[in-house]
Amino acid sequence: MAGAKKKIIGCAAVLEEMLPLLPSDLAYEILDFGLHFRPSNLKSALQKAIDASARDVDTIILGYGLCSNGAVGLKAPKTATLVIPKVHDCIALFLGSHESYKQQLKAEAGTFFLAKGFIEVGDTPLDEYKRTVERYGKERADRVMRTMFGHYTRVLFINTGHQDLSKCHEHSRQMAQQFGLRYEETKGSRVFLEKMIRGPWDREFILVKPDETVTIEQFLKQT
């Protein structure tokens, strides 16, 4: 597959992290981050993008994981292979591996993860809080967020090596302060993102052959 003509289809948060790594001749398509909140819509949007891309490439790399089962049921075109990282969500992509993700959650289960991609697309809980204040008032917004964040203890910003992160640091600290959480930063890794682009597509990936369908079991198999 090394010489295959490839295309990446991913959500805005993942592509924000990947763009500095992409070769100039590698095609990509960005889908709306908001689709994550409607898995059935995510699935249909992904399938539509996959089908539309099939005539131009023979390998389609998805910048998505399981994502609330949004990837389950996707069908590879008759002429192209799908490559999907074997992760439940994109946090593992920013930390470098699914194992690193599990280690962070084991260290502190009440962790809310942030990365540049999430902040740049403007869809973090702090953004949602501000919108709720504008629409319903501070009292109701505070009540809603207390319910949502009652089990969280820290905000962990994943630094994947971008040059200017001042805006991201400020946003992450503000979010931690607003919701009464501890703020921490950890060093991320671009290893997984690099492997998505260039390979090798090893046991950390799901390869869906032409005309085959993605199953939940493929994500549950141990890497």
Regions inferred by a protein language model and the residue ranges of each:
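Active-site rim beta-loop-alpha module in soluble metabolic enzymes
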Residues: G110-M175
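A short beta-strand-loop structural module common to alpha/beta enzyme folds
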Residues: L26-N41, E185-K187
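N-terminal basic/disordered segments at the start of proteins
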Residues: M1-S24
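Long, charge-dense
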Residues: K75-L126
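Extended, charge-rich low-complexity interaction segments
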Residues: V57-I61, G65-L66, G70-G73, F113-Y129, ...
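Glycine-rich, highly charged phosphate/nucleotide-binding loops
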Residues: P39-A52
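Gly/Ser/Thr-rich loops at beta-strand to alpha-helix junctions
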Residues: I9-E16, L35-H36, I60-V72, H88-D89, ...
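C-terminal accessory domains and tails appended to enzymatic cores
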Residues: E184-T223
